Amino acid sequence: MSQQRTLNNTIRATGVGLHSGNKIHITLRPAPVNHGIVFRRVDLDPVVEIPASGDLVTEVILCTGLTRNGAKVQTVEHLMSAFAGLGIDNAIVDLSSAELPIMDGSSAPFVFLLQSAGILEQNAAKRFIRIKRSVEVRQGDKVAKFSPYDGYKLGFTIEFDHPMIPHKQSHYEMEFSTAAYIKEISLARTFGFMHDLEDMRERNLGLGGSMDNAILLDDFRVLNEDGLRYGNEFVRHKILDAIGDLYLIGGPILGAYEAFKSGHALNNKLVRAVLADETSWEWISFPSSAAEQPPVVYTHPACI
């Protein structure tokens, strides 16, 4: 049986908000079966709970943000990506601010936190969303698409007119699994261009950004002294973001995702398009008595 998962223990961390620049405290807690991922704004009175749901997405410029009852939580994509990568179905995320900490700009610190807390398999079958027929959304020349597939596969193409992002480094595909996610995706950092930085600061965005938590490029080169973690780190980070954005669909996915120049807005548009068309997907579980077995996607917790 492919079982639901939560954390074995509570774990805490502190970091800086990418856009606010504020110090943020985050606490990750176990949650019961079928609870899902829920963010809690514990700095508010009363505390506001915000489920990790695609239909609550209200912010898609430079991050993915959720809003419920007037309370916001922004920059959820990297933690959601880590949850998806390790197969965590149920968790409570307490926040002292309206934004998650950016950590080092990748999801690797969140993966480390989850591994440190331990992963607990629960006595209930994991519920997958299986794509039954293709769904595609477009915005100008940008495209994002889901197709039926026995497993979870992601392919992404970016297009930037920059010498550090040549065409041969602009496409990446991966067969999703916990091991592949940790090794190939989790270390890829968010990135930005110097010429965009001033505009962002004028809009009170990117106030916590630095070369400690992002790749920064001028017109010709990467400015970070340590360079890149992968030769194609830019497109790998886009897949990292997509994995987090798509996990807001409400569960792990069985299907193939293909994207060209997609971002948070189009990823959310795809999630909403799938959920709005009940003929395009179905819930499926793989109890121990089932004749059909789940694709090998998630590594056993003892091996993570």
From Swiss-Prot:
InterPro entries according to UniProt: Ribosomal_Su5_D2-typ_SF, UDP-acyl_GlcNac_deAcase, UDP-acyl_GlcNac_deAcase_C, UDP-acyl_N-AcGlcN_deAcase_N
Gene Ontology biological process terms, A to Z: lipid A biosynthetic process
Keywords: Hydrolase, Lipid A biosynthesis, Lipid biosynthesis, Lipid metabolism, Metal-binding, Zinc
E.C. numbers: 3.5.1.108
Enzyme kind, highest EC tier: hydrolase
Catalytic activity line of the entry: a UDP-3-O-[(3R)-3-hydroxyacyl]-N-acetyl-alpha-D-glucosamine + H2O = a UDP-3-O-[(3R)-3-hydroxyacyl]-alpha-D-glucosamine + acetate
Active site: H264
Cofactors named for this entry: Zn(2+)
Residue numbers binding Zn(2+): H78, H237, D241
Superkingdom, natural source: Bacteria
Molecular function GO terms recorded: metal ion binding; UDP-3-O-acyl-N-acetylglucosamine deacetylase activity
Pathway(s) this gene product operates in, as recorded in its UniProt entry: Glycolipid biosynthesis; lipid IV(A) biosynthesis; lipid IV(A) from (3R)-3-hydroxytetradecanoyl-[acyl-carrier-protein] and UDP-N-acetyl-alpha-D-glucosamine: step 2/6
Cellular component terms per the entry's GO annotation: membrane
KW Phosphoprotein (keyword) present: no
Family listed: Belongs to the LpxC family.
Function: Catalyzes the hydrolysis of UDP-3-O-myristoyl-N-acetylglucosamine to form UDP-3-O-myristoylglucosamine and acetate, the committed step in lipid A biosynthesis.
HAMAP family: LpxC (MF_00388)
Protein name (Swiss-Prot/TrEMBL): UDP-3-O-acyl-N-acetylglucosamine deacetylase
Organism the protein comes from: Xylella fastidiosa (strain 9a5c)
